[in-house]
Amino acid sequence: MNLSQLHVLVVGGATGGAATALLLARAGARVTLLEKVAQPRAVGAGIGLAENGLAVLESIGLGPAIAAHGRAVDSPAIVDGRSRLMLAPPRPTPRVRMIRRSDLQGLLLDALAAEPRVERQFGAEVIGAERDGRVTARVDGRTVEHRADLVVGADGVHSRIRTAGDFGARVRPPGIAYLRALVDVEAAQGVEAWTGAGIFGSFAVDGGTYFFASAGTRACRHAIAARDLEALRAVWARAYPPSIPLLGAVRRFDDLIFNRVIRVDCQRWVDGRLALLGDAAHAMSPNLGQGANSALVDAAVLLDELRRAADLASGLDAYQRRRRPAVQRVARAAGSMGALAEITNPVARWLRDRLLLPVAARFGGDAAAVVMQELPATLLAIGRA
């Protein structure tokens, strides 16, 4: 398919949407990017870029910048609350780079600004869409109508494109929540700890440490409801002593980011000229670190299948047939991993640690291949073609 004849409207300017806009524009498409945030700003905490996501970003020329801003995760093991090894990563260890989410977004925004075939419209909130490619947005109090050959909904868990189309979506919270923060101390353990209070992970980023912690125990919930930072520190000091310098470096309760996990599963990713990508199509538990990485893979595969196809409809059908089963496998695995990690009952934890984790260790290499979804070399080649 000749992409130079294609006008694509990408809704959502975060990681998946920005990468989609760049990939399609560099392949010849004319792209309009709508982002509801009027002024892009530093948001979020940290993000782990796995080998599949890194390959996509490297294919659009961001490899050197990510290497400069990110920090390699050498051996992302799982330990217990006393820092004893529970599960080592598979060998060879897949590449992972941890980066501040704001740094990654800044790199993508700069790349978009330098791409002449991308028109960026910030402060554009989508309020409606039709399967024939018509999209209605609100900009500065005005209603603006758009029409495109293809509309890509990369607008996240609460996607307006998904609600406008017929995707057979199921949206549900699995009952898991996390706290995240960036602190300017270098006290990262470089591991994920499965403790009596849930998960605590900490990894080095440029100029500090990114950490995340479960927020599901009764003591954690009470501390969060009361906005009591000292009580939260005490919960984690008992469960995992290496958390002490990290939570101690949090100056205000509002410096913590609180996220409830929401799962999204769609029976279809395509409805006419509307197509979903990233969390809009398949938001998952974060326990395998594949949320944003899967969105990047979506972007590359969408480009690949459109280029291969004779027409738009067949390209979109091939995209969803190639991506949906692979993402579903990863989402199920992430949900299972999250459920295992959040076990707080001592007897159930003992059984998990003695019976389930040794079995998981035996199949680590096979599991890593499933998580990657596509060969990194394939993804790299798609963007460079």
What are these regions (language model features)?
Residues I60, E115, Y240, F253, ...:
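Acidic-histidine catalytic/liganding microenvironments
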Residues L9-R26, R30, L34-V37, G153, ...:
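Conserved mid-domain beta->alpha element of the FAD-binding
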Residues N2-V8, A25, A50-G165, A169-E186, ...:
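Conserved N-terminal helical subregion
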Residues G190-R221, L229, R233-Y240:
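Active-site substrate-recognition segment that forms the wall
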Residues M1-L6, L288, D304-A385:
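C-terminal helical "tail/cap" subdomain of flavin- and related membrane-associated enzymes
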Residues P40, P92-M98, G289-A292:
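Glycine-rich "substrate-gating" loop/helix at the edge of Rossmann-like oxidoreductase active sites
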Residues G128, G201, C266:
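Short, surface-exposed charged micro-motifs
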Residues A223-D255, L312-A313, R321, V371:
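Flavin-binding catalytic cores
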